[in-house]
Amino acid sequence: MRGVSFFGEWMRKHYLLVSDFDQTLSFNDSGLVLSEMLGINGFQERVASLSRLNLVQSGAELTYLLRHDNDFRGVRRADLIEVGKRIRLKGNIALLAELLRDGIDGFRFDFYVVSAAPWEVVNSALVGIVPPDHIIGTHFTFEGPDETVGEIVQVHAGYGKVAAVEALRLRLGVPTDRVVYVGDGSSDIHVMLHVNRGDGLTIAASETRLIAQIATRTVISDDALSVLIPVLEEIGGYDATRIRLVFEEQGLLIQEWDRVRTDWLTIRDGAAVESAA
């Protein structure tokens, strides 16, 4: 593997890095993709209506619709798996997972995905990238020969994400100040506040007002590897020159880095850029 000077086998500190899925590792909302696949109109309007009523925790709207909306009843396990295959992922998730697993300059990371989306959707989207036992999503029972969605077993939205992250932290024996959480929307507010209280690092993957105000850092990019920027700066103490070197060791160039209050990044394959020059 390239970059052995930065990614050694000997680790000094153990961290837990948890990421949301919808619009954090992907460009899509799982519920919207499911609606479009099944030809169901008005998904966003239904979600907005549930939000106005405060009927469910933020992020759990799809779960509610799957159980209580006539148009969504009868969705099968196979449908959820197919949705995952249609999700458009951000770039370099596999490389991000590899670098976190192998360690960064003496820091070792356990990488987990915690999402309010159905587990089958997230697992299908990330198959071969993130191990199934490192994905925590909403679980249902499935009924009958068609395996249609049945009862809700567990939802990881709102305070459910807090419980999931805390359970992971305790199981892995990670101190509160060595937790990193990455999220994009209102369903991440509670868990970000929880991580902040423990002096962990929170990273917003969108400029959603509430999240950007809570998160330690905000990074906007279509490449999942951009998460490493605040990790390397805040945890590793890297400056911009050293960060660029880390990316170059992996054959990547940070082509654009517009730093205001938000880090905007465009990451390109280094070999492709050099051949085009």
Q: PLM features: residue spans?
A:
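Alpha-helical substrate-recognition element adjacent to the catalytic core
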Residues: 1-139, 222
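C-terminal cap/substrate-recognition subdomain and adjoining C-terminal extension
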Residues: 84-277
